[in-house]
């Protein structure tokens, strides 16, 4: 320990209080007062950021802990008539989305703690119907609220296979990110079933289909340039919002992009934040390789430690872009053992002048997007903002010359 540090520590415990000690004492007093009294602020006072009491355990973005003037969650002018679970009783767009909620993130006091999770008898509150989908960590079922007759989606996490900390993390990321118009709405409240078999939380129901189902319905023809631009305008807006909060989705794929109107693709939302982590977080790699994984992930061994980086989302977006346009994937795995990917990498490195045939229909601007998203050098990849600018006005496919008949 340096002499200056020794002197500072001595002053903190033996001598007069230093500036650092007074600041720490003040912050502790603020936290204690909040936990003991919970006094509501005057409605005329402006919102102030509160101390991050749960940052080390939950690791949330800073803006996720902003509060409104009454220390309650701003909930988009929703009416909460349900007895146990706060789900909106009205379904109009004006009531479901408010300007205040979409422009800011707020949180109700205590919702980021590891308090005991409330038990709820699902049969008393909901009529649970068919299963909508399943994933690595849980499954989703369609349900109808008995009082309001509103359809919602319930995401279940089997308790034997789920740690409470993992469930709380996913709920909080889902809840805090849902103010964005292109991210699935998650309603307030973490619960567990009365028989202790599962944790669950409630989200809005998508009546149409996922992007995967929409593309498969085209019989490998793709959804077209116009619809692809609409989808990516929404998805890139959501991912750019997450990246601005230093959060990485880490599981972007067509199944996790929901299409609420399959006719014009006017309403698109991103879902599933089970693997979401903060930038620079260290995680263990799991044996789970899919078409969307970046090259650096495909060469990783099981349980190897990785540092979370935004560039993995950018790679996945490049794959999704190709999938929307062509109706199929460019390759099965981003490894040199996979010939289609090896050909792409050889062209990127200029070792082969011939562009892979799969990419021939794309324009120069679209090829630039691929080069800046599907490059094995993750530091050279674009940001979500760069991709959004490229897709805004540029043509994605080459112009096809129509032969003029000769008379």
UniProtKB/Swiss-Prot annotation:
Keywords: ATP-binding, Kinase, Nucleotide-binding, Serine/threonine-protein kinase, Transferase
Gene3D superfamilies per the UniProt record, alphabetical: Transferase(Phosphotransferase) domain 1 (1.10.510.10)
InterPro entries: Kinase-like_dom_sf, Prot_kinase_dom, Protein_kinase_ATP_BS
EC number: 2.7.11.1
One MF annotation (Gene Ontology) recorded for this entry: protein serine/threonine kinase activity
GO (cellular component) term, any one: cytoplasm
Chain residues that bind ATP: 132-140, 155
Annotated catalytic residues: 251 (proton acceptor)
Record's compositionally biased regions (Polar residues): 33-57
Domain of life, per lineage: Eukaryota
Residue span, Protein kinase domain: 126-397
Annotated Pfam families: Pkinase
Primary enzyme class: transferase
Catalysed conversion reaction: L-seryl-[protein] + ATP = O-phospho-L-seryl-[protein] + ADP + H(+); L-threonyl-[protein] + ATP = O-phospho-L-threonyl-[protein] + ADP + H(+)
Annotated segments matching region Disordered: 33-68
Family, per entry: Belongs to the protein kinase superfamily. Ser/Thr protein kinase family.
Protein name: Putative serine/threonine-protein kinase C01C4.3
């Amino acid at each position: 320990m340096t002499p200056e540090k020794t002197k500072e520590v001595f002053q903190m415990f033996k001598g007069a209080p230093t500036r650092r000690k007074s600041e720490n004492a003040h912050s502790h007093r603020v936290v204690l007062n909040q936990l003991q009294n919970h006094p509501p602020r005057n409605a005329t006072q402006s919102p102030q950021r509160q101390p991050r009491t749960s940052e080390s355990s939950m690791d949330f973005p800073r803006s996720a802990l902003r509060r409104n003037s009454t220390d309650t969650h701003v909930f988009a002018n929703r009416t909460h008539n349900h007895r146990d679970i706060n789900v909106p009783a009205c379904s109009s767009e004006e009531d479901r989305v408010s300007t205040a909620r979409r422009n800011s993130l707020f949180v109700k006091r205590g919702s980021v703690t590891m308090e005991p999770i409330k038990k709820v008898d699902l049969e008393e509150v909901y009529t649970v119907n068919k299963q909508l989908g399943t994933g690595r960590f849980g499954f989703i079922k369609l349900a109808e609220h008995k009082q309001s007759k509103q359809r919602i989606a319930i995401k279940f996490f089997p308790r034997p296979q789920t740690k409470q900390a993992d469930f709380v993390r996913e709920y909080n990321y889902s809840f805090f990110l849902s103010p964005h118009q292109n991210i699935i709405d998650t309603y307030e409240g973490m619960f567990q079933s009365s028989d202790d078999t599962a944790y669950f939380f409630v989200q809005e129901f998508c009546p149409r289909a996922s992007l995967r189902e929409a593309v498969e319905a085209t019989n490998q023809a793709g959804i077209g340039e116009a619809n692809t631009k609409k989808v990516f305008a929404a998805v890139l807006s959501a991912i750019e919002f997450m990246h601005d909060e230093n959060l990485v989705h880490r599981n972007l794929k067509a199944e996790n992009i929901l299409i609420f109107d399959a006719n014009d693709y006017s309403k698109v939302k991103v879902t599933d934040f089970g693997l979401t982590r903060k930038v620079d977080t260290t995680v263990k790699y799991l044996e789970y390789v899919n078409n969307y994984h970046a090259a650096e992930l495909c060469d990783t061994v099981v349980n190897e430690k990785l540092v979370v980086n935004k560039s993995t989302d950018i790679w996945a977006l490049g794959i999704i872009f190709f999938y929307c346009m062509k109706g199929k994937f460019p390759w099965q795995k981003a490894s040199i053992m996979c010939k289609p990917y090896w050909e792409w990498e050889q062209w990127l490195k200029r070792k082969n002048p011939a562009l892979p045939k799969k990419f021939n229909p794309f324009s120069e601007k679209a090829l630039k997007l691929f080069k800046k998203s599907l490059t094995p050098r993750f530091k050279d990849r674009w940001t979500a903002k760069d991709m959004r600018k490229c897709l805004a006005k540029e043509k994605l496919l080459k112009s096809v010359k129509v032969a003029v008949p000769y008379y």
